[in-house]
Design a protein with these regions (language model features):
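Generic N-terminal leader/targeting and pre-domain segments
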Residues: 1-5
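Cys/His-clustered metal-coordination modules, chiefly Zn-binding fingers
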Residues: 102-174
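Long, charged N-terminal interaction/targeting segments
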Residues: 6-128
Length: 174
């Protein structure tokens, strides 16, 4: 069976990313004891599940798991290190995001839970987001010109529409 001529493999990866995110958010919401290692365990489970159920390679599933961990880690770091809300990290109104995704994230993103999940010993330099990777919802800022790219669902990171740079970051803490 051949794939349709309009088939976009990044659409499949975006869909798989969202499936993985839903699994992790659902697991966090249901858990009574939330820990950093538990998040990694949920991401690993989601990686195996999406590799089995969707038409993506194990290599792509591993990349998606890495990108999902990066996105969750960035959100957790931002909310726990600032006085700002998750909507500030996103960089736009949450009304633009599918309700199921934002509800799952907000239900698990209370400050107490996030504080428990934040592991200071694993502090890191800010993540660099590159063209061609998949990212979840939120705002990326071009490292070259400061242009903001808004993602209202998981999607492939394009080059900057203003300067064509391929390196981005999320809103950073002070």
């Amino acid at each position: 069976m051949t794939k349709p001529s309009n088939f976009d493999p990044f659409d499949a990866l975006s869909s798989a990313y969202e499936t993985m995110y839903e699994h992790v958010a659902g697991g966090l919401h249901a858990a009574t004891h939330k820990t950093g290692p538990m998040i990694q365990e949920l991401i690993d489970e989601a990686e195996a599940k999406v590799s089995d159920l969707q038409d993506i390679t194990e290599e792509d599933a591993k990349k998606l798991a890495t990108w999902l961990k990066r996105d969750l880690d960035d959100a957790i770091n931002y909310v726990t290190e600032t006085e700002y809300a998750l909507t500030d990290w996103l960089g736009f109104e949450t009304a633009l995001i599918k309700a199921s995704f934002i509800n799952a994230l907000l239900e698990t993103a209370d400050p107490t839970t996030l504080a428990l999940l934040r592991m200071k010993e694993n502090a890191h330099e800010p993540y660099i987001y590159r063209t061609g990777e998949i990212t979840g919802f939120g705002t990326l800022i071009c490292d070259e010109c400061g242009e903001k790219l808004h993602f209202h669902e998981a999607g492939k990171i394009p080059p900057c529409p203003k300067c064509h740079e391929t390196s981005f970051h999320r809103i950073q803490t002070d």
